[in-house]
Curated annotation (Swiss-Prot):
A GO BP entry: translation
Domain of life: Bacteria
PROSITE patterns in the cross-refs: RIBOSOMAL_L21
NCBIfam families in UniProt: L21 (TIGR00061)
The family this protein is said to belong to: Belongs to the bacterial ribosomal protein bL21 family.
Lineage of the species this protein comes from: Bacteria, Pseudomonadati, Bacteroidota, Cytophagia, Cytophagales
Known function: This protein binds to 23S rRNA in the presence of protein L20.
An annotated GO cellular component: ribonucleoprotein complex
Subunit text: Part of the 50S ribosomal subunit. Contacts protein L20.
Name the record gives this protein: Large ribosomal subunit protein bL21
GO molecular function terms noted in the UniProt entry: rRNA binding; structural constituent of ribosome
Length: 102
């Protein structure tokens, strides 16, 4: 059994007892979180497709930790002018354990 759920503007395929990394969510580590925007719910060969979401379906999870992704480096340069600029960015992420698909 799996579900396609929209979290933070992105779509994730989730299954029970699996981890997903999503953009930072509000909430403390160890707290429960519920995602109500379920786009598809699949069980064996039966599919429930929402328009745009499945009515009454939800995905429950537990926030395990807040962390940062690897650094992405951007480099700008203008030729013959001596202008060079380096900028780094680290995306804040949340690790979520999926506990149930309802």
């Amino acid at each position: 059994m799996y579900a396609i759920v929209e979290i933070g503007g992105k779509q994730y395929k989730v299954e029970k007892d699996h981890f997903i990394y999503v953009y930072r969510l509000e909430g403390a580590e160890g707290s429960a979180v519920t995602f109500d925007n379920v786009l598809l719910l699949a069980d064996n060969n039966q599919y429930q497709v929402g328009a745009p979401s499945v009515a009454g379906a939800s995905v429950s999870g537990k926030i395990l930790e807040h962390l940062k992704d690897d650094k992405v480096t951007a480099f700008k340069k203008k030729r013959r002018k001596g202008f060079r600029k380096t900028v780094g960015f680290r995306q804040s992420l949340t690790k979520v354990l999926i506990t149930s698909l309802n």
